[in-house]
């Protein structure tokens, strides 16, 4: 495996998820974020002490956006030909094998990635080795 290219430190401005208004009060209201649209809504009006709303200011650095802790960006791979696309970009991108790839094809993909020194994020998934 090739180490990732040098980059600025990855900084997440907020790791806590944004909660939907009153999702803590009612079971029927899911916690997944929805923008409040009511005319009197205190979250929409940004009252002090209410839930934070997602905004552009929480976005991460453009250089480190979508970057994994290893410093690579994920690239979805479905066959051996896709792995060969990463030959020149193995310091920037890491291969991630798609969920619908069979275990036989996975073994071929992993072998080719090793030859090209491409990092595979989920190399151990769905690959059984006999004991």
Swiss-Prot record:
SUPFAM superfamilies: Ribosomal protein L32e
Gene Ontology annotations of biological process type: translation
Top-level lineage group: Eukaryota
Repeat keyword on record: no
Cited PANTHER family: 60S RIBOSOMAL PROTEIN L32 AND DNA-DIRECTED RNA POLYMERASE II, SUBUNIT N, RIBOSOMAL PROTEIN L32
Family: Belongs to the eukaryotic ribosomal protein eL32 family.
Subunit structure: Component of the large ribosomal subunit (LSU). Mature N.crassa ribosomes consist of a small (40S) and a large (60S) subunit. The 40S small subunit contains 1 molecule of ribosomal RNA (18S rRNA) and at least 32 different proteins. The large 60S subunit contains 3 rRNA molecules (26S, 5.8S and 5S rRNA) and at least 42 different proteins.
Function: Component of the ribosome, a large ribonucleoprotein complex responsible for the synthesis of proteins in the cell. The small ribosomal subunit (SSU) binds messenger RNAs (mRNAs) and translates the encoded message by selecting cognate aminoacyl-transfer RNA (tRNA) molecules. The large subunit (LSU) contains the ribosomal catalytic site termed the peptidyl transferase center (PTC), which catalyzes the formation of peptide bonds, thereby polymerizing the amino acids delivered by tRNAs into a polypeptide chain.
Protein name: Large ribosomal subunit protein eL32
Organism name: Neurospora crassa (strain ATCC 24698 / 74-OR23-1A / CBS 708.71 / DSM 1257 / FGSC 987)
């Amino acid at each position: 495996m090739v180490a990732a290219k040098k980059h600025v430190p990855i900084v997440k401005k907020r790791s806590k998820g944004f909660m939907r208004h009153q999702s803590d009060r009612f079971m029927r209201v899911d916690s997944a974020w929805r923008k409040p649209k009511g005319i009197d809504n205190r979250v929409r009006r940004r009252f002090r002490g209410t839930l934070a709303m997602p905004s552009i200011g929480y976005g991460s650095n453009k250089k480190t956006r979508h970057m994994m802790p290893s410093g690579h960006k994920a690239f979805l791979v479905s066959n051996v030909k896709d792995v060969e696309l990463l030959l020149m970009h193995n310091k920037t991108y890491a291969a991630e094998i798609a969920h619908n790839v069979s275990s036989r094809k996975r073994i071929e993909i992993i072998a080719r990635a090793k030859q090209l020194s491409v990092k595979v994020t989920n190399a151990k998934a769905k690959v059984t080795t006999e004991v």
